[in-house]
Design a protein with these regions (language model features):
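Structured, active/binding-site neighborhoods that engage oxygen-rich ligands
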Residues: 2-440
Length: 440
């Protein structure tokens, strides 16, 4: 089935091209996995059924309970808020001059050798955007949640159950690409276009590739940040479609990840989806992490890092300060300080898995420890929070964090401003429960 048309799409901008990092040697997408021809028609891209195989976690194929879905979303949001980059992301809602002034103060500190470093500022503006709260990761997670709801809505009611979510994923990405193309068409030049979102380099590049007519897996493979963890944040939410079925969740996560990632970026999404699906199905911490490890090939950087990180974590699992005690080891043996950005899935996913083990699945222990790893604080705390939140449920997230993190600011996806994650979790749980009931 073809998705609805989305209008004329534009080529990626020169500004996007300027962000490109040196490309690693091209690999067969997904280490040999294939969805068919790179330029396959949309109907062929959606044709593959969501697989039924793979090891099953404890529990059944029934819909996940609202408490675990709530824990997943609130844990992710709390982790997102806990990392220092959240304030930078939320500052996007402040007037541009406030961010310019912060940059100027940073330059002043560098040139004058001062150790008083600037932080995001409000000055004479309302400071609400700079208060503790979720930022980009939580908003892209909500984007994935909306996609799930669309898949189980009336639009795709005529499709087989195993194709509905995939059709919704395809529609979501092409709609977004169409919105960006329309914004570019309205601007006198592409660089001055007012875009309807803020996103990772991999997502912007993937959307640009869609705009030129490419299809997955090319949109993720021909991508300067194919290795980042942007798809992992979406993957943990897509896992709600397959509670207790890690392999099926991993396959769905890969389908989505191929729009923006390749290589370790895809492997990381598969791993996080498998772990969360296991947790939603009732698996304990060890089984959930093992489900993730099963998705990571030994020959990959992410596979080697994850195996090593989890081995380190198991040595600290019985210590009262296990997760916090593990931080220096992860900093020195897993986290890389060479590249410009700390968003490689080969680092953030192993960190999240290791801290889940070392904390015994406690969101209150895993998230603060992940936030201590400043290099990967943009997403590792969110990933750790999502998994431990799914393991512990909504009640495991402290009330103060729940209150501070349940409402989205709209700093990455402005249309989501005001979205209540508790209400979204309830809607997801009810929708999936109804679909499960109707399928019996």
């Amino acid at each position: 089935m073809d998705s609805p048309a989305h209008g004329q799409l534009a080529a990626p901008s020169a500004a996007e091209d300027a962000t490109a990092a040196p490309r690693r040697p091209a690999l067969t997408p997904g280490g040999g996995r294939s969805r068919g021809a790179v330029a396959a028609p949309r109907c062929e891209h959606l044709a593959a059924a969501e697989p039924q195989g793979g090891a099953q976690a404890p529990g059944t194929d029934s819909a996940p309970g609202q408490d675990r879905v709530e824990g997943l979303l609130l844990g992710l949001a709390a982790g997102d808020a806990a990392g220092w980059p959240a304030a930078r992301h939320r500052a996007a809602r402040m007037p541009e001059w406030t961010r310019r002034l912060t940059r100027e103060l940073d330059t002043f500190a560098e040139q004058n050798a001062t150790t008083t470093l600037p932080v995001p500022i409000a000055l004479n503006q309302p400071p609400e955007p700079l208060r503790l709260g979720p930022s980009d990761d939580a908003e892209w997670a909500a984007f994935a949640a909306e996609t799930v709801l669309t898949g189980f809505g009336e639009l795709f009611a005529g499709l087989p159950a195993d194709r509905r979510t995939r059709a919704a994923v395809d529609l979501a990405w092409n709609t977004l690409a169409g919105e960006i193309a329309a914004a570019a068409d309205r601007a006198p030049e592409v660089e001055s276009a007012v875009l309807p979102l803020r996103a990772r380099i991999s997502v912007r590049a993937g959307l640009g590739n869609l705009a030129t007519g490419l299809r997955p897996p090319a949109t993720g493979h021909d991508n300067p940040h194919y290795f980042d963890d942007a798809a992992c944040v979406r993957a943990v939410v897509l896992a709600v479609v397959h509670p207790g079925r890690p392999h099926a969740a991993a396959e769905l996560a890969e389908f989505d990840a191929r729009y923006t990632q390749d290589g370790d970026g895809v492997h990381g999404a598969r791993a996080m989806a498998a772990a969360v699906a296991a947790a939603l199905g009732g698996a304990d911490t060890g089984a959930a992490v093992e489900a993730a490890l099963e998705q990571l090939p030994d020959s990959t950087e992410i596979g080697r890092n994850a195996a090593h990180a989890v081995k380190l974590a198991r040595d600290f699992a019985d210590e009262p300060a296990g997760a916090f005690a593990l931080v220096p080891l992860l900093e020195h043996q897993i986290v890389d300080h060479v590249y410009s950005y700390g968003i490689a899935a080969a680092e953030t996913v192993p960190v999240a898995l290791a801290l889940t083990v070392a904390s015994g699945g406690s969101v209150s222990a895993a998230v603060p420890a992940a936030a201590c790893l400043s290099r990967v604080a943009d997403s590792a705390p969110a990933l750790a929070g999502a998994l431990t939140g799914a393991l512990g449920g909504g009640a495991a997230v402290p009330a103060a964090w729940r209150d501070a993190c349940r409402t989205l600011a709209g700093c990455a996806l402005p249309r989501l401003a005001g979205t209540d994650l508790v209400e979204l979790a309830g809607l997801l749980a009810r929708t999936l429960a109804e679909a499960d009931h109707n399928s019996r």
